[in-house]
């Protein structure tokens, strides 16, 4: 047990967060985010659900093998197969944790598990005992704990603590509770659970009623000392408690809570930006702590007050969360050493071969735009290290568009194919982007159903890079592709091809599975 005022931050962006539609990440993106979370100072990184799929297993195994500075956890149902898979996935971690769970509420016992209280209790104890054979650090979660009988929670937590659990987690799985209820429940559990003084109580709050952060703070007041959260509050349905909001609430209102975390708050904004770039999903402008408007002041009255004294309308300093105007860091005359130094200060550790690729892409971009910002460099790095391996490669594209009643936008593309050939196709469409996607679909020979398409600027100025995100469906599976360029049509084409290249990987895996 640590000091009573230390709060452990358990980040589940890579597991609960990544399960949300539109937030899927490829393996390299997951590893990059895991490294950033370790630099941020989170205590536990829940890297995934190893038994969910071979890809999830490999992602957890890769993170456990290379990320240091934080405990690496994998999620496992209370079954032998799940726990053994999780143990293998985290075995290379510096500090491995198995996080096992079983549903405990009457609703889940009856309709999900078809088990009675005694069976659930026995399953929970057996799961913890099995997990302890592999690791010393075992966390147990009572799924849907908030809707579970409090006296039964006391019984089951007492039993799993006796079986060897070091952390017991109380999830508000459906975001149903209120702060007063959460505070009272945690206080009761701390009083009545046998062995409570030997473990850490944890909260895991969902945001269905917009109360995830408030409920998490209430849990801390009730005696919890671990908070489970995600960067930007991502997660299933309405999301999870937002890491940045929890951490800054504790820091800003220390006089009320008297609690500290190990988070380096100056890395909060860069971490938020990294997640946005990996997933292509922006936070809303008025998002607390990391939104574009979080430290903006439009009102004349507010601006006047800010000029007089900053604290009249700001309770935090932007610099405290790592937010400052993106500095102009490099230009076309900058050399390799300056680039590598800047990337290192941004938190990127690249192999020499990756640095060479980034430098080449940087020089090409510097010829197109005068000012290179951190966000530009970040997009280059993620494009080099984070995407699917190129299979179809865009060689050229041409768009002809016109306005008026007789307009008929036309797009033609030339691609290098996976087998080394070149293919050219053209198509007309309702607009230039539609024509472009139709031409690309013909060229790759696959019918991809477009679900959504959006593009955003990732830096500043009229020559800023645009990042296009394509969400598409193929054979019942959803895929997300991203592309970045100073030309928004080229960015759109690259995003579409990113989806196509991911499909090739899926087809290859399916072929191997059938052959096996």
What is the role of each PLM region?
Residues 174-177, 184-308, 313:
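Catalytic alpha/beta core domains of metabolic enzymes, predominantly
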Residues 478-480, 484-513:
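Mixed-charge, glycine-accented linear interaction segment located at domain edges/termini
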Residues 6-7, 13, 248-250, 254-426, ...:
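A mid-to-C-terminal "edge-of-domain" accessory segment
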């Amino acid at each position: 047990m640590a000091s009573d005022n230390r709060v452990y931050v358990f980040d589940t962006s890579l597991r609960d967060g990544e399960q949300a539609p539109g937030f899927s990440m490829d393996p390299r993106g997951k590893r990059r985010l895991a490294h950033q979370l370790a630099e941020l100072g989170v205590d536990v990184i829940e890297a995934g659900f190893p038994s969910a799929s071979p890809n999830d297993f490999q992602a957890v195994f890769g993170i456990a093998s290379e990320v240091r500075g934080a405990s690496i956890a994998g999620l496992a149902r209370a079954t032998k197969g799940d726990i053994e898979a999780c143990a293998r996935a985290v075995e290379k971690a510096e500090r491995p944790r198995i996080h096992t769970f079983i549903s405990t509420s009457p609703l889940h016992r009856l309709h999900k598990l078809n088990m009675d209280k005694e069976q659930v209790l026995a399953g929970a104890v057996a799961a913890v005992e099995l997990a302890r054979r592999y690791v010393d650090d075992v966390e147990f979660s009572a799924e849907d704990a908030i809707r579970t009988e409090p006296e039964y929670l006391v019984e089951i937590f007492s039993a799993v603590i006796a079986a060897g659990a070091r952390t017991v987690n109380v999830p508000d799985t459906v975001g149903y509770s209120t702060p007063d209820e959460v505070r009272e429940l945690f206080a009761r559990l701390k009083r009545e659970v046998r062995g409570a003084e030997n473990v850490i109580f944890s909260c895991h709050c969902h945001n269905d009623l917009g109360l995830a952060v408030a409920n998490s703070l209430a849990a801390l007041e009730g005696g919890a000392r671990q908070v489970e959260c995600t960067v930007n509050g991502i997660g299933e349905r309405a999301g999870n408690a937002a890491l940045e909001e929890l951490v800054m609430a504790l820091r800003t209102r220390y006089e009320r809570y008297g609690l500290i975390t190990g988070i380096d708050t100056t890395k909060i904004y860069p971490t938020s930006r990294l997640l946005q770039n990996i997933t292509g999903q922006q936070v809303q402008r008025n998002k607390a702590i990391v939104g574009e408007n979080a430290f903006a002041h439009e009102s004349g009255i507010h601006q006047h007050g800010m000029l007089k004294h900053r604290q009249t309308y700001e309770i935090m300093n932007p610099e405290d969360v790592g937010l400052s105007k993106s500095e102009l860091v490099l230009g076309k005359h900058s050399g390799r050493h300056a680039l590598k130094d800047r990337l290192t200060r941004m938190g990127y550790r690249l192999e020499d071969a990756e640095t060479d690729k980034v430098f080449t892409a940087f020089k090409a971009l510097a010829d197109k735009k005068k000012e290179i910002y951190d966000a530009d460099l970040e997009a280059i790095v993620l494009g080099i290290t984070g995407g699917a391996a190129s299979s179809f490669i865009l060689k050229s594209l041409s768009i002809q568009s016109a306005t008026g009643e007789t307009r008929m936008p036309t797009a033609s593309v030339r691609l290098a194919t996976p087998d080394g050939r070149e293919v050219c196709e053209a198509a007309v469409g309702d607009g230039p982007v539609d024509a472009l996607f139709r031409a690309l679909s013909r060229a790759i020979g696959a019918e991809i159903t477009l679900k959504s398409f959006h593009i955003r600027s990732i830096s500043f100025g009229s020559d800023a890079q645009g990042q296009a995100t394509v969400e598409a469906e193929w054979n019942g599976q959803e895929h997300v592709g991203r592309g970045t360029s100073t030309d928004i049509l080229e960015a759109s084409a690259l995003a579409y091809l990113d989806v196509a290249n991911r499909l090739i990987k899926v087809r290859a895996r399916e072929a191997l599975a059938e052959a096996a």
